[in-house]
Amino acid sequence: MGRFISVSFGLLVVFLSLSGTGADCPSEWSSHEGHCYKVFKLLKTWEDAEKFCTQQANGWHLASIESVEEANFVAQLASETLTKSKYHAWIGLRDQSKRQQCSSHWTDGSAVSYETVTKYTKCFGLNKETKYHEWITLPCGDKNPFICKSWVLH
């Protein structure tokens, strides 16, 4: 009986330690604060990258970044995946207005509440020169790796 309780307790500890981690995300995706992320090394235009993300599953988009903690997590993920890359990495922000100012929403519909922009063009990526810690504006037709984001799976 004591051994059964010990094994049951051990399984409970393992289950609880996995909750909120990558266990809730698809294989090879990383988990952070209730979302799943994956850096894709495929080179795509901003629009093709967003289309690729949305084709993975319902509700998935290019990554939105809503806090400095999330920015640091995504930058580390990109740096680890895109080692020795000569490319920037697309995120889910693009200027859709004709007034040359930043859109107020990410591709997943969430509001822009955190930003670190280095200069203006049309689509936004993470700047490889800053180890993906700063945003950079790039021509939307450039081909770059990209980061998809979704809610954790339940």
UniProtKB/Swiss-Prot annotation:
Q: Which Cys pairs does UniProt list as disulfide-bonded?
A: C25-C36, C53-C148, C123-C140
| Cell compartments where the protein resides | Secreted
GO MF term set: toxin activity
**Keyword tRNA processing included in the entry's annotation:** no
**InterPro entries membership:** C-type_lectin-like, C-type_lectin-like/link_sf, C-type_lectin/snaclec_domain, CTDL_fold
Read off the Pfam families from this record.
Answer: Lectin_C
Give tissue specificity per the record. Expressed by the venom gland.
A GO cellular-component term linked to this record: extracellular region
Signal as a keyword of this entry, yes or no, is yes
Instruction: Could you list this entry's UniProt keywords, alphabetically sorted.
Output: Disulfide bond, Hemostasis impairing toxin, Platelet aggregation inhibiting toxin, Secreted, Signal, Toxin
Residue ranges of domain C-type lectin in the record:
32-149
Where is it mainly found? secreted
Signal sequence extent:
1-23
Q: Which Gene3D superfamilies match?
A: Mannose-Binding Protein A, subunit A (3.10.100.10)
Quaternary arrangement and interactors, per the entry? Heterodimer of subunits alpha and beta; disulfide-linked.
State the similarity comment: Belongs to the snaclec family.
- What job does the chain carry out? Inhibits ristocetin-induced platelet aggregation via binding to platelet glycoprotein Ibalpha (GP1BA).
Q: What name does this protein carry?
A: Snaclec dabocetin subunit alpha
